[in-house]
Amino acid sequence: MATVTARLPRARMNLWRLEWLRLRRTPRALTLAAVFVFFGLLQPLLTKYQSQIFRHVGNGVRISFPAATPAQGVGGYIGELSGTGLIVVVVVAAGAFTFDSRHGLATFLRTRVTGLWQLVAPRFTVNAAAAALAYVLGALAAWYETALLIGAPDAGGMLAGMLCAAVYLAYAVAVTAFAAGIARGTLATVGIALAILFLLPIAGVYRPVSRWLPSTLANAPVDLLRGTHHLSYYLPAFAVTVVAIAAALAVAVLRLRAREI
């Protein structure tokens, strides 16, 4: 009995290490970092030279833009938090949570844990941390490029924005786990997760609830840079997002536990 008990913590620890190695030794981590860093370097460049770009694209038609501000330089990158960057995060996370799509892998993993939470927790934590790190790397690239081409953005706003983005990306990973509890395949999981993430902001048109929506955190970095709001303004969204993350993971575990392999 003591031998079996001693093996359980080791098995749990190995699952954490397994998820870390799976992310690091495959193109997933590199893809995440590359996408965010690419847009972090590109968007300030596009913002700085948008007049020249439109002149070439528009067959010589001159279009004048006001002088770019540091907030605009970084703002283009922040937009990827609700666009390409978000899609890549969901696709990578879906690959981790849809282990039931492969019968052999599902059997192997499920027979080595005493509860489904031991499978979900490492996948959520590692993928959320990887997404946050990738975003921060891209934000640092955008920060450097903007300071070089346009002017230095507000440091406090940048750091507060990184915090908001990290929490929102953790929410996106939790929503993906929830979707994996509904659908078995990777493609269906990605579709459900993106539908939730893209449709939820529509509720923000009703002003009384807009401050409480997790999607508010996706736009927060821009407002923090512009000085429109302070970090305390987003405390309701932080609270709701944390509760939503816990609820999504709990439902994911319950759904996965009830699923037949």
Language-model features: locations:
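Short, membrane-interfacial amphipathic segments enriched in basic
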Residues: 1-16
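Junction motif at the cytosolic side of a transmembrane helix
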Residues: 2, 243-261
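Secretory targeting signals
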Residues: 2-6, 28-29, 33-96, 120-187, ...
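Transmembrane helix-loop junction
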Residues: 22, 99, 112, 143-147, ...
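Hydrophobic transmembrane alpha-helices of multi-pass small-molecule transporters
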Residues: 44, 113, 131, 201-202, ...
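Short helix-terminus and kink motifs of transmembrane alpha helices
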Residues: 95, 99-103, 177, 254
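Short helix-to-coil transition segments within interhelical loops
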Residues: 108-115
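Short hydrophobic, aromatic-rich alpha-helical segments embedded in or entering the lipid bilayer
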Residues: 208-229
